[in-house]
UniProtKB/Swiss-Prot annotation:
Induction: Expression is sigma D-dependent. This is Uncharacterized protein YjcQ. It comes from Bacillus subtilis (strain 168). InterPro entries: Phage_Tuc2009_YjcQ, WH-like_DNA-bd_sf, WH_DNA-bd_sf.
Amino acid sequence: MNKDKLRYAILKEIFEGNTPLSENDIGVTEDQFDDAVNFLKREGYIIGVHYSDDRPHLYKLGPELTEKGENYLKENGTWSKAYKTIKEIKDWIK
């Protein structure tokens, strides 16, 4: 699993308003999803992450990209052509 692609996919889905979002939607393990979301929050790419049972949750309302997160999407724009929708995400992040 490519961590950078997973992080990009999570940012892209939040940006597109495709929340709520979970590991089941992306096809990764709970730990992989939690690690990616925690990284994105800790490094200042996203805000509005809710926590329950010591896990991050990306609900319909709340998660937003910061300016840093938006810049990450722009800087990795070449991935945008390869990644179009959440339907393709499971194969794309491998």
